[in-house]
């Protein structure tokens, strides 16, 4: 694999911005440092690309942010948290909304890379896809131009840095507690096939399996994240009885709560309902939703902190996992 600017910076013991300044023969770099970096470049047969020539020389202190849909509560909050943290470091941001279609995501990333950005943040695990080479090739290509930071997704690539919630473990633990409290027919509602959604589903299924319960396809329901659509789908299409609902988003849980009200099911006595992301929606519901706090603000802060370290030439872990916790309100009784 050919060397890139990250490799040269690491071998020379300098920041990637310093490598760029050496490439451009900047007077801001001492002759001693220039000689050291050039020796590494020559030894490794390194040919600078456009990224290496531009980084650090004409930095605009600007970070690109791409998310699928800013109307999504989780993503809107994440963008706000990122903007706040970046501002504390003196950085501005450019936002692109890509939508969810694969080609649209690729185009959005390509467009934002044409701007003068120092780093790129992708909000949400939808950018990981199914982790086939074709799904993530554009991410790896982007990471050859600027440092790439992925929120709530994971890609094995040395130039992509991931910060994510431990959604598998919290889902496993929550379902286990439901089972221990006597709930045996647990419905799982999800609205995405993203990395995060798959990890939540894995936690749900393994908790059932480890407690001797069968995994029932009828109790794994994919539905659009619209409250009334969730209510109607449960009412019209799910015939199997269930005594608890675990979801991948608070909107899905709110829809399940509407369904329970329509059916005259008492929550939490007859049915427990658990949301995800602990959004404002959780406290707007009646009764108020128990919901898993995925630590969105902390994840965004860690992402920006990691970014600054990378831009300064430090070596950091490529995967940072943040624990989650359940916020109990009025829709659970365990």
Where are these regions (language model features)?
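N-terminal helix-turn-helix DNA-binding module of bacterial transcription factors
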Residues: 1-60
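Short beta-strand segments enriched in small/hydrophobic residues
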Residues: 11, 16-21, 55-71, 121, ...
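Alpha-helical recognition/docking segments in bacterial nutrient-uptake
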Residues: 58-176, 235-236, 240
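Hinge/beta->alpha junction and helix N-cap segments in small-molecule ligand-binding domains
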Residues: 68-77, 95-104, 126-130, 153, ...
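Short helix-capping segments at alpha-helix termini
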Residues: 88-89, 208-215, 239-240, 262-268
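Short acidic/polar active-site loop segments enriched in Thr and Asp
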Residues: 118, 183-185, 243
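Flexible loop/turn connectors
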Residues: 231-334
